[in-house]
């Protein structure tokens, strides 16, 4: 568990040090990554300009849940044009609606839209959402009484390493939990379940690996060949002339936002794959100084970018492979969910021909589409149960 963090997008919620290192390592060892096209965007990331790292940080869903309004650059409340639930629609629907408003040019000065809470009473908002009010104030916005600019922001990766229910992988001795593991959230994680997932499966992984270690008797010696390969990979940037690593990272973030982002189609995904391939090639000619290896942040940035490029390629190719729209993955050229009975998940692996994506059928072992585990007289929701 290395902490996922889709920071390869122009707007993202995780801190910049999160760089998908765990998934990149899994790829290099030949493990399968599942559902990598499923990138969740939080609809309301703070939009404060490119000059501040505050841009992209989350403004919590409780703001919309409490009755906050989303307003475009023409001062129009627009969410009911997209969904009957308005601002309380699911994350993916609200993110796509905001993205479409941006694409149509109905934007705020920084290029996003606004969230408005003032109609709920400034004093009430300031009391109920103290942390959010302070976060906005730090960037010059008055959440309680004014308008705050927001933008969809890459928040969570539902995909990850293929694991079983006890966190084991196809590589003996490797256990994966948290955001590095795929499958726990399907195609669309519910708010709050990220922490629960890490806590539950982190505990399971600890218990299982302890039990497995006892059965092994003795630990295996490290594979010297793999260690040599990883060392050789790590020192690659010292063989090229020092260059601007950050410039390449900005190119990656722009490519992923523009072509592999909230709304996708085949042309854009192919364009994104080409841009990623170009970045891979350019990385070979951009090095870092090796004069001081201790606390060499440029070296760290180079290795982090390599991991982000590796996983970005998987996301783009998995997105191209999935020709339907499920959860957080939306294809404008394939807007329908397709047959539920024929559901599948994608499996991406790195091989001799590069990244290859295949499909694996979903096995409905407990409940099938259209069926319910509830009895005929049982309420399906807590609201129904209370009536």
Model-derived regions, located:
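An anion/pyrophosphate-binding glycine-rich loop and adjacent beta-alpha core
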Residues: 25, 31-142, 146, 208-215, ...
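Glycine-/small-residue-rich beta->alpha transition segments that form the dinucleotide
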Residues: 2-6, 180-181
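Glycine- and aromatic-enriched mobile tails/lids
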Residues: 64, 71-80, 85-87, 98, ...
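FAD/FMN-dependent oxidoreductases across multiple families
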Residues: 130-174
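Alpha-helix capping and helix-loop boundary segments enriched in small/acidic/polar residues
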Residues: 6-17, 54-58, 89, 123, ...
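Beta-strand segments within the central parallel beta-sheet cores of soluble alpha/beta enzyme folds
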Residues: 36-42, 148-149, 219-228
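Glycine-rich nucleotide phosphate-binding loop and flanking beta-alpha elements
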Residues: 6-7, 40, 169
């Amino acid at each position: 568990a290395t902490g996922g963090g889709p920071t390869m997008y122009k707007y993202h919620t995780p801190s910049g040090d999160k760089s998908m290192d765990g998934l990149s390592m899994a790829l290099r060892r030949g493990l399968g990554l599942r559902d990598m096209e499923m990138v969740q965007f939080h609809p309301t990331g703070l939009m404060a300009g490119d000059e501040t790292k505050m841009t992209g940080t989350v403004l919590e869903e409780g703001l919309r849940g409490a009755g906050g309004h989303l307003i475009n650059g023409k001062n129009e409340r627009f969410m009911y044009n997209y969904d009957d639930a308005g601002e309380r629609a699911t994350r993916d629907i609200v993110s796509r609606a905001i993205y479409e408003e941006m694409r149509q040019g109905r934007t705020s000065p920084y290029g996003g839209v606004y969230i408005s809470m003032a109609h709920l009473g400034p004093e009430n908002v300031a009391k109920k959402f103290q942390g959010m009010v302070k976060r906005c104030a730090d960037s010059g916005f008055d959440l309680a009484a004014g308008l705050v600019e927001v933008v969809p922001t890459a928040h969570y990766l539902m995909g990850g390493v293929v694991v079983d229910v006890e966190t084991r992988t196809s590589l003996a001795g490797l256990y994966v939990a948290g955001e590095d593991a795929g499958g726990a959230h399907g195609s669309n994680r519910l708010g709050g379940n990220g922490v629960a997932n890490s806590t539950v499966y982190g505990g399971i992984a600890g218990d299982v690996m302890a039990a497995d270690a006892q059965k092994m008797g003795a630990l295996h010696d490290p594979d010297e060949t793999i260690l040599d390969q990883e060392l050789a990979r790590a020192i690659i940037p010292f063989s090229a002339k020092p260059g601007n690593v950050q410039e390449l990272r900005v190119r990656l973030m722009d490519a992923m936002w523009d072509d592999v982002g909230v709304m996708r189609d085949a042309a854009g995904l192919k364009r994104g794959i080409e841009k990623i391939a170009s970045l891979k090639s350019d990385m070979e000619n951009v090095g870092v100084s090796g004069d001081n290896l201790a606390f060499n942040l440029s070296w760290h940035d180079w290795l982090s970018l390599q991991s982000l490029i590796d996983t970005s390629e998987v996301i783009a190719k998995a997105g191209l492979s999935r020709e339907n729209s499920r959860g957080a993955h939306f294809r404008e050229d394939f807007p329908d969910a397709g047959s539920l009975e024929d559901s599948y998940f994608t499996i991406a692996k790195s091989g001799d021909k590069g990244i290859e994506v295949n499909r694996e059928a979903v096995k409905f072992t407990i409940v099938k589409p259209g069926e319910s585990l509830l009895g005929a007289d049982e309420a399906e929701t807590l609201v129904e149960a209370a009536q």
